Amino acid sequence: MALRTRLGELLRPLNAEYGKVAPGWGTTPIMAVVMGAFLVFLLIILQIYNSSLIIENVDVDWTNGIV
């Protein structure tokens, strides 16, 4: 028999929802927005790395690193 703990009792409702699917699109639009925001973040980082996006007082000279 499994040991019953307070943490297990708190997490039991989450496990009861396992396998159930929300009707319709569910949270798909929210995930699409989050993925779009992450894409924009990655593009900004890439532009800073390529010096395509110039920001004042941000040095992107990678040759002066620690030797």
From Swiss-Prot:
GO terms for molecular function: phosphate ion binding. The chain crosses the membrane at residues 29-49. It is a single-pass membrane protein. One of the components of the core complex of photosystem II (PSII), required for its stability and/or assembly. PSII is a light-driven water:plastoquinone oxidoreductase that uses light energy to abstract electrons from H(2)O, generating O(2) and a proton gradient subsequently used for ATP formation. It consists of a core antenna complex that captures photons, and an electron transfer chain that converts photonic excitation into a charge separation. Belongs to the PsbH family. PSII is composed of 1 copy each of membrane proteins PsbA, PsbB, PsbC, PsbD, PsbE, PsbF, PsbH, PsbI, PsbJ, PsbK, PsbL, PsbM, PsbT, PsbX, PsbY, PsbZ, Psb30/Ycf12, at least 3 peripheral proteins of the oxygen-evolving complex and a large number of cofactors. It forms dimeric complexes. NCBIfam families: PRK02624.1. This is Photosystem II reaction center protein H.
